[in-house]
């Protein structure tokens, strides 16, 4: 019995001596029992080496994809004529110089949008300086009748009135004249808006910035 105990003790000491120094050091998400098992500034959290939230290190999270600008992510998809389009309930935050895409819209009866403008249930003359805003910016109609200031990359600016929503949630139907859902960063302007900015509406889409006037 004494010989067996001596043999087991000898085996245990041999195993310890064979373990190289630092063999237990783990990197991100490696196994650990305490912070001594983790490399550098990492600490042991729930049996895995990870960043120390109190220190604020980002060693393990450094490769995590950054969130989309403005934190606005697609809420779903719609398929129009075999092509999928993202839908949105939100738009990027409005600032004193909000980046956007200017598109052209026909606000007259039978025009691009199908139905009358959301704000007043009326059709409009395209000689008016008017716009439709993406769903998030339209904000349930809270910007109806308000003026926004649009600035083109050529330096020209124009004030235009919000009369409609560029629907980012729905599309591909009769109500939307078969068009896909609007992107979440659209200012859909009348011919008069494009003309005042010195832009060719046939270009289709141009980069602008806008703010509340």
UniProtKB/Swiss-Prot annotation:
CDD domains listed in its UniProt record: DPBB_kiwellin-like (cd22270)
Disulfide bonds: 28-60, 32-44, 38-49, 72-90, 80-172, 119-144, 166-172
Signal peptide residues on this chain, from the entry's feature table: 1-24
Keywords, ordered alphabetically: Allergen, Disulfide bond, Hydroxylation, Secreted, Signal
Biased composition (Polar residues): 93-107
Region (Disordered) location: 91-121
Gene3D superfamilies hit by this protein: RlpA-like domain
Keyword Lyase attached: no
One Pfam family this sequence matches: KWL1
GO cellular component: extracellular region
Modified residues (4-hydroxyproline): 65, 67
Cross-referenced InterPro entries: Kiwellin-like, RlpA-like_sf
Subcellular location: Secreted
Principal localisation: secreted
Domain of life the protein comes from: Eukaryota
Posttranslational modification: Undergoes proteolytic cleavage by actinidin to produce kissper and KiTH. Three forms of KiTH are produced by cleavage at different sites, the main form produced in vivo is KiTH-1.
UniProt similarity note: Belongs to the kiwellin family.
Protein name: Kiwellin
Organism: Actinidia deliciosa
């Amino acid at each position: 019995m004494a010989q067996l105990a001596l043999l087991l003790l000898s085996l245990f000491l041999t195993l310890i001596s064979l373990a190289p120094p630092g063999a237990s050091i783990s990197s991100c998400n490696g196994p650990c029992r305490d912070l001594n098992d983790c490399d550098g500034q990492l600490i042991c959290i729930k049996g895995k080496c990870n960043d120390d939230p109190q220190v604020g290190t980002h060693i393990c999270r450094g490769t995590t994809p950054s969130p989309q600008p403005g934190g606005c992510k697609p809420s779903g998809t719609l398929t129009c004529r075999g092509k999928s389009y993202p839908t949105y309930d939100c738009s990027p935050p409005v600032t004193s110089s909000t980046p956007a895409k200017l598109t052209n819209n026909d606000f007259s009866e039978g025009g691009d949008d199908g139905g009358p403008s959301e704000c007043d249930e009326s059709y409009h003359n395209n000689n008016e300086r008017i716009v439709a805003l993406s769903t998030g910016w339209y904000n349930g109609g809270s910007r109806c009748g308000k003026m926004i200031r649009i600035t083109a990359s050529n330096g020209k600016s124009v004030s235009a009135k919000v009369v409609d929503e560029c629907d980012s949630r729905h599309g591909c139907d009769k109500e939307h004249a078969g068009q896909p859902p609007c992107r979440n960063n659209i200012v859909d302007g009348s011919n008069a808006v494009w003309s005042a900015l010195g832009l060719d509406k046939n270009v289709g889409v141009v980069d602008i910035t806008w703010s509340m006037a």
